Design a protein with these regions (language model features):
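Active-site proximal loop and beta-alpha junction motif in alpha/beta enzyme cores
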Residues: 2-83, 89-274
């Protein structure tokens, strides 16, 4: 409907419209759902949080046009977060595939700075996320919660990587959610080399932001891409997230950012009466 219209013409589309988008889907993987809400005007933080709570998905993304860019905020059912990869990819999907916003680059104003996204080849969408710098830590910091580990790393201020033996060990992890609160990180990323058709496989636990286990975690690539490059020298990476829904992600590492790519689809759209 909106294909071919300039950004300046999109104001007629604005209302509290929403789309449920599955991000980072694969052939059998259902990806991570995000609800993208297109706001016609700013809303109070408490109202945004209540909407996210009512919708109940791992993240709700709130989009609002600001000049030629887009304000983007992410809320779990319990808190606003500083960065969310899959909900950013979902927001990009809505702008490009539902609203037909033209242009090669889409820019989002976020709590993590200005992020950009674009359409890639082979049905992929790509977003640029800030690169994290990875430092080794003592495995005992995580082993009490996750069991025996090969390596452990701090990734930026809010993530840790726990390297397990193999894919079977990863899938067999049984984690006590309460014990994860003892780890001083928002994201606890368990990772192993290999997995069906990919370079590495992961599971991600985030109870501090209200997610016992995240279905697919685009922001984890901020740490995984540089960790893989340090390990192998390869700037590209393919990842399978071994959650119940499952997901597939791709990345390319640059000096200051990580381009994270995946496939998206709209599950349904509607109106938010708020």
């Amino acid at each position: 409907m909106w294909q071919g219209l300039g950004v300046e013409s999109l104001n007629v589309a604005f209302g509290h419209r929403l789309w449920w988008v599955d991000a980072f889907i694969g052939e059998a993987e259902r990806g991570n759902p995000a609800v993208v809400v297109l706001l016609e005007r700013p809303m109070d933080d408490a109202d945004l949080q209540q909407i996210a709570f009512e919708l109940g998905v791992s993240e709700t993304a709130f989009l609002r046009r600001v000049g030629d860019q887009w304000s983007l905020r992410w809320f779990t059912p319990t808190v606003e977060v500083d960065l969310c990869g899959h909900a950013t990819l979902a927001a990009l999907h809505v702008l490009l595939n539902e609203l037909g916003v033209p242009g090669g680059e889409i820019y989002f104003q976020t709590r993590s700075g200005v992020l950009s996204g674009r359409r890639l080849s082979d049905g992929l969408l790509g977003i640029d996320l800030p690169r994290a710098y990875v430092e080794p830590v003592d495995t005992s910091v995580l082993a009490d919660t996750l069991g025996p580990l090969k390596d452990a790393f701090q990734a930026g201020a809010s993530s840790v990587l726990a390297v397990v033996e193999d894919y079977d060990a990863l899938c067999g992890l049984s984690v006590d959610t309460l014990s994860l609160f003892l780890i001083p990180a928002s994201l606890v990323i368990a990772v192993c080399e290999g997995g069906p058709g990919v370079d590495i496989s992961v599971r991600v636990f985030a109870p501090r932001i209200g997610l016992a286990e995240d279905p697919v975690t685009g922001s984890a690539m901020c740490a995984l891409a540089p960790w893989w490059a340090d390990r192998t020298g390869a700037p590209t990476l393919s990842v399978r997230q071994a959650s119940a829904r499952g997901g597939v992600m791709y990345s390319r590492l640059f000096e200051k950012n990580v381009e994270v790519a995946g496939v998206t689809r709209t599950f349904f759209g509607g109106d938010l009466r708020a």
